[in-house]
Amino acid sequence: MEQVQVTALLDHIPKVHWAPLRGIPLKRRLQTSAIVTWLALLPICLIIYLYLFTIPLLWPILIMYTIWLFFDKAPENGGRRISLVRKLPLWKHFANYFPVTLIKEGDLDPKGNYIMSYHPHGIISMAAFANFATEATGFSEQYPGIVPSLLTLASNFRLPLYRDFMMSLGMCSVSRHSCEAILRSGPGRSIVIVTGGASESLSARPGTNDLTLKKRLGFIRLAIRNGASLVPIFSFGENDIYEQYDNKKGSLIWRYQKWFQKITGFTVPLAHARGIFNYNAGFIPFRHPIVTVVGKPIAVPLLAEGETEPSEEQMHQVQAQYIESLQAIYDKYKDIYAKDRIKDMTMIA
């Protein structure tokens, strides 16, 4: 049976369609370069870090940095944002590659704090990065006074150099301590959580929006505990930039992905898109418009005096209101930005 599945996988590998070496506009080459830079940033940082160890003069500095890396709690306490890095021209090229567009449904009061919940996860949440880790789509202009922190796995902040670059973009750990530290650090401080997580990425396919949301109550508990309003976000096109190989439940691929997720806490979707010199083989995403709609804030109930945790009833009431708002966003824009959909948005878990 497994041999049949492997054969089917090999048969699914596409014939390569090569891109022309000439006649491509400079702006498109710059856009592709920006995407490649971001995708290659992790191995580049690790290679630089290891290469520096070949220079004995730098050993004392590198040893101190490596020790400091394990004790540095910045990723859990708001990070080290550098506005100039978020505003680099590189990110404009990154966003224009697809392109990514940000649509604002309502104002956010800079005196409040917000948990911005992003859907769908996609393969690697490209639009979440473009919108909330950079200023490529003008987030700060549309939401003055709101300071967003895109959250990711804590394990990413154990990687030398790469961790520091991510923090310069305002990115932080998705741990509970990190979330609460950011939300309590002052008015306007907000977090962006890709709510579906690794499980949802395994369902990311063009023309579909299968969400893992029914059992996700952690972000709602967090909002009520900290008095932060919830902001639903939906990106049309996030699932359309990669083709994912068939990984239906019980298949060889599915079992490997679940095993890997259990061991590491994250998973690796087996997907492909295009390459630098071809249009259909590689891990550079397809060019496809991504339109991110930021919904109106949803106020959450306040905890009664002496209470430290919300009740199950409170969380389920807020969840129902949240799903209703998210559905309203999808229904409002689906015939504009998801005309070629195979099916409508579905809550699969």
Curated annotation (Swiss-Prot):
It is a multi-pass membrane protein. Pathway: Glycerolipid metabolism; triacylglycerol biosynthesis. Its EC number is 2.3.1.20. This is Diacylglycerol O-acyltransferase 2B. Keywords: Acyltransferase, Endoplasmic reticulum, Glycerol metabolism, Lipid biosynthesis, Lipid metabolism, Membrane, Transferase, Transmembrane, Transmembrane helix. SUPFAM superfamilies: Glycerol-3-phosphate (1)-acyltransferase (SSF69593). It comes from Umbelopsis ramanniana (Oleaginous fungus). One of its GO terms (biological process) is triglyceride biosynthetic process. The lineage of its organism: Eukaryota, Fungi, Fungi incertae sedis, Mucoromycota, Mucoromycotina. Catalyzes the terminal and only committed step in triacylglycerol synthesis by using diacylglycerol and fatty acyl CoA as substrates. Required for storage lipid synthesis. It is found in: Endoplasmic reticulum membrane. Belongs to the diacylglycerol acyltransferase family. Pfam families: DAGAT (PF03982). GO terms for molecular function: diacylglycerol O-acyltransferase activity. The gene is DGAT2B. Optimum pH is 6.0-8.0. The chain crosses the membrane at residues 44-64, 114-134. One of its GO terms (cellular component) is endoplasmic reticulum membrane. Coiled coil: none annotated. It catalyses: an acyl-CoA + a 1,2-diacyl-sn-glycerol = a triacyl-sn-glycerol + CoA.
